[in-house]
UniProtKB/Swiss-Prot annotation:
This is GH30 family xylanase. One of its GO terms (cellular component) is extracellular region. It comes from Thermothelomyces thermophilus (strain ATCC 42464 / BCRC 31852 / DSM 1799). InterPro entries: 6GAL-like (IPR039514), GH30_C (IPR033452), Glyco_hydro_30 (IPR001139), Glyco_hydro_b (IPR013780), Glycoside_hydrolase_SF (IPR017853). Activity is enhanced by 10 mM Co(2+), Cu 2(2+) and Mn(2+) to levels as high as 44%. Partial inhibition of activity from 5 to 15% is observed in the presence of the following compouinds at a centration of 10 mM (from higher inhibition to lower): EDTA > Mg(2+) > urea, Zn(2+) > Fe(3+). GO terms for biological process: glucosylceramide catabolic process. Optimum temperature is 50 degrees Celsius. Xylanase exhibiting endo- and exo-xylanase activity. Shows the highest activity toward beechwood glucuronoxylan, which consists of a beta-1,4-linked xylose backbone decorated with the methylated form of D-glucuronic acid (MeGlcA) attached directly to the main chain at xylose C2. Also acts against wheat arabinoxylan, a xylan without MeGlcA substituents along the main chain, but the xylanase activity is about two orders of magnitude lower than that achieved in the case of beechwood xylan. Shows no activity against carob galactomannan, konjac glucomannan, or barley beta-glucan. Keywords: Glycoprotein, Hydrolase, Secreted, Signal. It is found in: Secreted. Glycans are attached at N194, N237, N331. One of its GO terms (molecular function) is glucosylceramidase activity. Its main location: secreted. The gene is Xyn30A. The recombinant xylanase could be used for the production of disaccharide units and uronic xylooligosaccharides from glucuronoxylan, which in turn would be utilized as prebiotics carrying manifold health benefits.
Length: 477
């Protein structure tokens, strides 16, 4: 018995010595909780344009698998924002999103003729699952266009502008108030279905004309419409008044260019939204509002589930860095990949649905986003972190529960990394334990070893990986 005790003590001493040696040899990252940046609202995706319909056609097991990999915080990416498309089309042909008022009432002075099917192109089902099964609290509803009868071109596709806006006069009259009523009614239908729409957008890529739902708006026209939409929402019977978002421009630079004209209605809208197609996030926008990167994807590449092969546009490694650039360099408060799950063989989505086999295949793009979303939860505050070497990109966040998540993107070889809080941190902020998860060519948010002693977490960060180290306070130890 005595010899066994001695052996165990020696083994423990050897392990402690090994951990100490690794800590002394590694890079030390120091998190300063007193230096704060933006609040993080979350990470997410969309199932617009009938992608939710595709998901609903899976066998029950496939449906659950698709929902799990998107929204579960234990075995999925833990996405916390769902972006829904507000339909404008007269029917569901092709992948069109059907309108909640597909038939013209004949005049903007007549009440709209609503036709709510309790499905919303199956987006309501996905929303209900996200909210009630997985605890998602942020639903962003965004319209690509008004119904065609409200527009200058009489069509919800091919551009056109909302009748009644400055420079957009129509023989049928001024449809601005009708469109505001339409959007508010959509939110009401969701509330009646026990889903709260928290954010509401009225345009998408307003500088672009497409053969599908699209509508042109200038920045001044957007401000003009916000002056109508805001009081409409406030005077409504909605139990929760959604925050107005604007304007989902095609690129970061384009959206930044709209902010001057929007400043006159800063008190009426509360969220700036931008895409990353024509320009990527690379700077902080000059606005008092949080900024979300609400749509980005590799739209052209053939489907790949790879983490890293050659740095291709659809690889998970690329998207780990894209999100980093938006959060750290662009000061974004949220990041959304275009589509979550769908059929087809492009990288426009993160999860591939095989309709014939009834199966789903997550890509490493999903797990890259999940390395953020699983551990940087809504309400987290980005904080300062220092000490990274040339091959490491780092970002740190303090969650509302007191845990601290440190993201490490490693472009070099295996690296011993120590994570600690700055000495200025108060006693109640000090961590009591740590865990780490990594994604690379062989892992998908897989827990890896993290030793913890004297307030310092030590992790061997794999080469060409994204690793998230989480420091837990005593209550979570």
């Amino acid at each position: 018995m005595y010899s066994l005790l001695i052996a165990l003590l020696c083994a423990g001493t050897a392990v402690d010595a090994q951990a100490l040696q690794q800590r002394q040899a590694g890079t030390t990252l120091t998190v300063d909780l007193s230096t704060t940046y933006q609040r993080i609202d979350g990470f997410g995706t969309s199932e617009a344009f009938q992608r939710a319909v595709q998901m609903s056609r899976l066998p029950e097991e496939g449906q659950r698998r698709a929902l799990d990999v998107l929204f579960s915080t234990t075995n999925g990416a833990g996405l916390s924002i769902l972006r829904n498309g507000i339909g404008s089309s007269p029917d569901m042909s092709s992948d069109h999103m059907v309108s909640i008022a597909p038939k013209s009432p004949g005049s903007p002075n007549n009440p709209l003729i609503y036709s709510w099917d309790g499905s919303d192109n199956k987006q309501l089902w996905v929303s209900q699952e996200a909210v009630h099964t997985y605890g998602v609290k942020t639903i962003y509803a965004d319209a690509w266009s008004a119904p065609g009868y409200m527009k200058t071109n009489g069509n919800d596709a091919n551009g056109g502008t909302l009748c009644g806006l400055s420079g957009a006069q129509c023989a049928s009259g001024d449809w601005r108030q009708a469109y505001a009523d339409y959007l508010t009614k959509y939110v009401e239908f969701y509330q009646e279905s026990n889903v709260t729409v928290t954010h509401l957008g009225f345009i998408n890529e307003p500088e672009l004309t497409t053969s599908y739902a699209s509508m042109r708006f200038s920045a001044s026209q957007a401000a003009e419409f916000i002056r109508i939409l805001y009081p409409t929402i406030q005077k409504s019977n909605l139990t929760y008044k959604p925050t107005i978002a604007c304007c989902d421009a095609e690129g970061w630079n384009s959206q930044a260019g709209m902010l001057g004209a929007l400043s006159s209605v800063n008190s009426m809208f509360g969220l700036v939204t931008a895409h990353a197609y024509t320009s990527q996030p690379g700077f902080s926008m000059n606005t008092p509002h949080p900024v979300w990167m609400t749509e980005a994807a590799d739209l052209q590449g053939a489907w790949t589930s790879a983490w890293y092969s050659y740095g291709g546009a659809g690889e998970g490694w690329t998207w780990a860095n894209n999100v980093y650039n938006a959060i750290v360099n662009g000061n974004a408060s949220a990041y959304l990949y275009w589509i979550g799950a769908q059929t087809g063989n492009t990288n426009s989505h993160m999860v591939h649905i095989d309709a014939n086999a009834g199966t789903v295949e997550p890509s490493k793009r999903l797990w890259a986003l999940g390395q953020w979303s699983r551990f940087v939860r809504p309400g987290a505050r980005r904080v300062a972190v220092s000490g990274a070497s040339g091959s490491l990109r780092t970002a740190a966040f303090r969650n509302e529960d007191g845990s601290v998540a440190v993201v490490v993107i490693n472009s070099g070889g295996d690296a011993a990394v120590n994570v600690r809080l700055a000495s200025s941190s108060s006693a109640d902020q000090q961590p009591a334990s740590a865990k780490a998860w990594a994604t690379d060519n062989s892992r998908a948010i897989e827990e890896i070893q993290a030793s913890f002693a004297d307030g310092v977490a030590t992790v061997n960060v794999p080469s060409r990986s994204m690793t998230t180290v989480v420091l837990y306070p005593a209550a979570d130890a």
